[in-house]
Amino acid sequence: MKSTPLNLYAEGNFELLNKEIIAIVGSRNCSEYGWKQAKKFSTALSQNGICIISGLAIGIDSISHISAMNNAGKTIAVLGAGFNNIYPKENKELFNKILENNGCVISEYPPEEKVNTKNFPRRNEIISALAFGVLVVEAGYRSGSTITANLAFKQGKKVFAIPSNIDSKLGIGTNSLIQKGAKLVTNVKDILREINMNKCKDIEQEWKYESKNVPIKYKNVYEIIGNMPIDINTICRRAELPIQDVSEQLTMLELNEYIRALPGDMFVKVWIN
């Protein structure tokens, strides 16, 4: 690191810092593909005794924390503000759940320190410093996740990257990292071999869409939505329906867990397994 933190505030089980730790980072506005891969890798790593560390952001961070806990694993969250100013606010519940599940939350900042965007590169540096390696799931070209990965390179850490569709803006940074020397990974064994864990539980899951049970009156809108985020205006245009009708259908599809809403009025299909 450029400079060692003068203080690190920790709440919860800080003994987790003695475990094998892998950081999982990626886009806040992830695609369904990114969501699926974060869940898959966090699940498999956790079931092999690896502790997952991430930054408590929405998107890939949240999925990684939650998947670890859902599989009896442990997770560490590193904050860019104090414990009394959780960011984003909607992840306060996730913050509490991590502590309830014997996880750990860490911050370089005093409890009352407010959110400041200048703090996040430093948070990213701490995440990579505490981990054996960093797994980048889905990242834009100049995103916080690519910053974390580049910091990991400088720290001499292992950097892993899941390849993305070359036409996807969400994956430009990930594919660029592979060109720079990040190890391309397609399953958890690729990571565990680097930790000298040759025997591992791999999670091979089949994923599909729940299209057959979608009510006929919602089918038209549902079929327009794919595994990459699409905005409501594009859906309206393709469905040739007014925005009010489309909004009502999107609400019903989301309530029935056929689709998932993303920031910026974007939507993706939900995978099932």
Language model features with spans:
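Glycine-biased, small-residue-rich flexible motifs in mid-sequence functional cores and linkers
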Residues: M1-N273
